[in-house]
Amino acid sequence: NETAQNSLLKVIEEPPEYAFFILLCENRNKILPTILSRCASVLIPPLSNDEIFEIFGSKNEFLAAYSMGNPGKFLSLSEDGEFLTLREEFFNKIPMLIQKKRTSIYPLCEFFEKNKDEKDTLFEFLTLFFGDILLKKNFLEGRIINRDKTETIDRFNTETTKQSVVSSLEIIAKLQRELGKYGAYALCVNDMFIKLWEEING
């Protein structure tokens, strides 16, 4: 935050001779200009999947793609059993969106409500999943994140149009914006899944 950054300013302006300070950030736009002007920026490029596999001796294609070249994130997620369990539950529930009865989405709504504390992760799963369907429709399978879930992606690819997938991504993005304004999580989630079901099933 801004207060913490300002507290660093004097130390950075007059550092002790024996020390170097290395500041790490994921988004330089969140760093105050007064801090940036006193630092030398070094961009660390993301690692390739093969480089991550070589470092950790693990060939989890999904985690490598999901981590987007960040080895620390790859390591953290590979050791996070709750994250992996949540993802499996998500993929067990998401096919309910292509069932022909609208009431089939209620267990999916309940799953999102039950895991409200993990809503950021769940919405990332949802966005990436629909993004993968769009990549499939555009013949860009090499960029798919959920590479171990191709059967589910293929099912949705068959049941959707390109326009319905684009519209679904817009519905998800709008819901995330509204959550920040209104905060009625259960109502917003239910409304979102109803709209997604209608978009997919006509």
What do these predicted ranges mean?
Residues E17-F20, C25-F125, F129-D132, K136-G202:
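Charged, glycine-rich active-site and insertion segments that engage polyanionic ligands
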Residues N1-L9, I31-L32:
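Conserved AAA+/SF3 P-loop NTPase catalytic/coupling segment centered on the Walker-B
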Residues E13-E14:
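Conserved amphipathic alpha-helical interaction elements at protein-protein interfaces in regulatory
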